């Protein structure tokens, strides 16, 4: 019964966004399951030969558990998007202490700290003690670098923000694929993780503020799968598809 209620909430939430969006395009696959066509790795020159983002068994895979000394490495969509509904699946591993995420409406700036990916990010946090952060929004824009949903002054987040209900699966659990939906329509941003709404946010005054306009992000840009500087991370992504709102 609980699962049925979750599905009803998801369908109703998506319907509201669709109703306000006007016409929609058809579903498109952003990852073909075979190679990284349509995606580019962006990193420091010293990391270029490390093959951090690869395709294995029909999924995009990142495994740096035994790798030292890497900087930030992003896998970035060639295309830009503004208003859309994005669906994907990700698989996390209990042995992975690192953090990942999906930046959206993002853009790389070569002039910042040797290169920086500006833009908001849907957080994906595998460590069990904080996996409830998954689906919340952290802003990687250079002048922000803070949680924007919930709105906090920096990267720190106390357990009082932990929801009463959340679902996070691991590969070790068997069917360990998590389902994530990201919907952006104007300044309305919604995330749904495994059938549970995690973010329902009016980003007016944030994603369209002077910092985001300066970096040309927040309203339109690329997707970027993220590996943090020095993180030991093991994660996989697959079934990445999108429907744009016209």
Predicted regions and their residues:
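Bacterial Sec-dependent N-terminal signal peptides
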Residues: 1-24
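Carbohydrate-interacting regions of secretory-pathway proteins
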Residues: 22-246
